[in-house]
Design a protein with these regions (language model features):
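Rhodanese-like catalytic fold shared by cysteine-dependent sulfurtransferases
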Residues: 4-6, 17-39, 46, 55-87, ...
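Hydrophobic beta-strand scaffold positions of dinucleotide-using enzymes
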Residues: 48-50
Length: 129
């Protein structure tokens, strides 16, 4: 009887562990600047998200980027990002805030986030407002 209980407890423990390992957590992908440029050329439906402050954005940003400051993400709904499954490509000045923002977006339920660092490494066109 003790052997049977031991076997059942062991089986239950392994089943519980197997169930936990099947739980998938969403995360963002980090890509290089070159990969981002390639992705922008190949994809059709994506958003380029600049998470710097509005004054930094006005000084120069990647063409067609929208600005939602990192400090705002997580404090309220983001009307500029209504589709939580859409590809969102995130950048900032150096890469620190874009990583923070990407983590926050994932926690908010966004499922297709790529982070590609900072505009300091951007070699393409920059537009000002």
């Amino acid at each position: 009887m003790k052997k049977l209980i031991l076997i059942l407890l062991s089986a239950l423990m392994f089943t519980g562990c197997a169930g936990a390992s099947n739980h998938q957590t969403h995360t963002y992908r980090q890509i290089t600047m070159d990969e981002a440029v390639t992705m922008m050329a190949q994809e059709a439906d994506y958003i380029i998200l600049d998470v710097r402050r509005p004054d930094e954005f006005a000084e120069g940003h990647i063409p067609n980027a929208i600005n939602v400051a990192n400090e705002i993400i997580g404090t309220a709904d983001i009307p500029e990002l209504p589709d939580k499954e859409q590809l969102i490509m995130v950048y900032c000045r150096s890469g620190r805030r874009s990583k923070e923002a990407s983590e926050k977006l994932v926690k908010l339920g966004y499922t297709n986030i790529v982070e590609f660092g900072g505009i300091l490494d951007w070699t393409g066109e920059i537009v000002t407002e």
